[in-house]
């Protein structure tokens, strides 16, 4: 009699009929070398009635799941992936209430990514996470917020129907990123270097050519390469400049990005455009306008 463990999904289901879709898919991934990866795509709704969407990737298969807790959409996505692996894409079995944690109400959040990220920062000796509202859009009854979360040199964005939701999504993305890298071996302080010392006072007192030109420039000339102009200012004042593209299009269907300046305090400006390059130029333009205001302001 063979002692070989079953590798087919039907055999695994027959061997362990009480396993949840997540458990079964994890077992299948372990035996085939394709481990499932779950990513939080969206979190919206109010705190008392949240809605989460998770993306699952296992090998070449991608599926989505949605639900009122973080566990339910993962189960749905896993169930759908299992159906694809079985060769039956016509059905996605419903996730029953037995899959939910009986100790928690369905609408109660199972995790606090904002608190978890702060705890991680304290454990590692990093500066606490910094959250910045990058954009507010949409009508008053359907607002959409985009928030950036920065921990040392790492930045992620989150979008949601409230600032709290967007903040949670951004924190969740950073936590996911930290799980894929070895945070113990990252020389974060060395990565930051000495480029965090560009303060508003040092900008106002600077007599450099580029910053002096910025102070007297109208910043309203059509077809100006604001990306190059901001790059020149950054090099002269010795601060880092990073463009972060946002995956989601704006409410008007345009590309979005953020321009992050490692000034002290950090500056983050939003930009939109019909192309990625135009969005960068718009973000650079907004950043230059902000720098100009702060340089003149006493």
UniProtKB/Swiss-Prot annotation:
Subunit field text: Homodimer. Interacts with dicer1 and eif2ak2/pkr. Also able to interact with dsRNA. Associates with ribosomes.
Primary location: cytoplasm
Disulfide cysteine pairs (residue numbers): none
Ranges for domain DRBM: 20-87, 112-180, 225-293
SMART domains (alphabetical): DSRM
InterPro entries: dsRBD_dom, PRKRA_DSRM_1, PRKRA_DSRM_2, PRKRA_DSRM_3, RLC_Component
Name of the protein described by the UniProt record: Interferon-inducible double-stranded RNA-dependent protein kinase activator A homolog B
Residues spanning the signal sequence: none
Keywords: Cytoplasm, Nucleus, Repeat, RNA-binding, RNA-mediated gene silencing
GO BP, sorted A to Z: regulation of regulatory ncRNA processing; siRNA processing
Domain of life: Eukaryota
Protein's cellular compartments: Cytoplasm, Perinuclear region; Nucleus; Nucleus, Nucleolus
Tissue specificity comment: Expressed in brain, heart, kidney, liver, nerve and spleen.
Family listed: Belongs to the PRKRA family.
Presence of keyword Nucleus: yes
Keyword Cell inner membrane in annotation: no
Gene Ontology molecular function, alphabetical: double-stranded RNA binding; siRNA binding
Biological role stated in the UniProt entry: Activates eif2ak2/pkr in the absence of double-stranded RNA (dsRNA), leading to phosphorylation of eif2s1/efi2-alpha and inhibition of translation and induction of apoptosis. Required for siRNA production by dicer1 and for subsequent siRNA-mediated post-transcriptional gene silencing. Does not seem to be required for processing of pre-miRNA to miRNA by dicer1.
Any one GO cellular component localisation term in the record: cytoplasm
Any matching Pfam family: dsrm
